[in-house]
Amino acid sequence: MTLKGVFLDLDTVGFQGDVKLRALEKVLSILRVFGVTPAEKVVENVSDAEVVILNKVKLTAEAIKRFPSVRLICVAATGVNNVDLAAAWEKGIGVSNVPAYSTMAMAQHVFALLLSLNQHLKEYEALMQQGAWKRAPQFTLLDYPIRELAGKRFGILGYGNTGKAVGRVAEAFGMSVLVAARNKDDKRPGRFPLEELLPQVDVLSIHVPLLPETRDLIGPKELTLLKPEAVLINCARGGIVDERALATMLRAGRLAGAAVDVLSEEPPLHGNPLLDPSIPNLIVTPHIAWTSREARQRVVQEMALNIAAFQNGELRNRVA
């Protein structure tokens, strides 16, 4: 069984030729590729494809009902919130995802952000550009205090693949790892209710998915529980942290710093409280934690395996 496929938004995975599609081309008789697909073009671009590959294109129930031939939807990501799973299920269309493809890339970015904050790299680079070192009366600059990570407490909210990988890196730096309990009934050793974990940690790293129950999970109350010398890192999803409350805390000096790779709207077409350049001790990156070339290539390889499994009547990484 050989299937016809379409990739609706290749530009979100790699548009400069650094990601190869050979693995997909081997398992599909035809692969049509679109760099981007606006909402009004989804049904037209899908056409007679039997396999639809997408990353961020939204597949609504209305669109799915109009697909004439689709048998499998392959999401080039772990989260599948942009696909109406109920509509796919009702029409007998399978849906697969790619879990854990960017685990190491994510862990790498978390610590790139943490180290940048901790070492005050932005601030010291600014001093260098201003010629401060040339004018210094001694061999070094001590304008911004640097703390060692060793001996500090690293809190993890969301202990899946990425949370575990981040924890291993934290331990390599000599940090103690504390994990937030999943719920009030989670009594496993080493797990702490969120309200008990927050006051203890020097770093809080967030790795939970964005769900109705996790939206604004870290709001004004939770931010106030953190120590003033604590640092918050969010490479999970925008919307988990109350962005306006975080901006307020940073301006007031109630937190030592924060770094986020995600915002509640991406791209932030309508602005965002965290994009104010006057906010101190804040780093914002444009959702790049997952984007190592290796991770993006791994997505392609894994989707090809998902399609091959489907052709063989097997279930692999199926969410519907």
Regions found by a protein language model. Name each.
Residues 162:
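Hydrophobic/small residue at the entry helix of a nucleotide-binding pocket
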Residues 91, 99-153:
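Phosphate-binding beta-alpha-beta segment of Rossmann-like dinucleotide-binding domains, i.e.
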Residues 95, 229-320:
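Rossmann-like dinucleotide-binding domain for NAD(H)/NADP(H)
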Residues 59-65, 176-178, 182-273:
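Rossmann-like adenosine-cofactor binding region
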Residues 1-49, 311:
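N-terminal glycine-/charge-rich "phosphate-binding" loop or analogous flexible N-terminal tail
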Residues 76-77, 93-104, 181, 236:
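Short beta->alpha connector loops at strand-helix junctions that form conserved
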Residues 156-157:
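Conserved N-terminal Rossmann-fold NAD(P)-binding element of oxidoreductases
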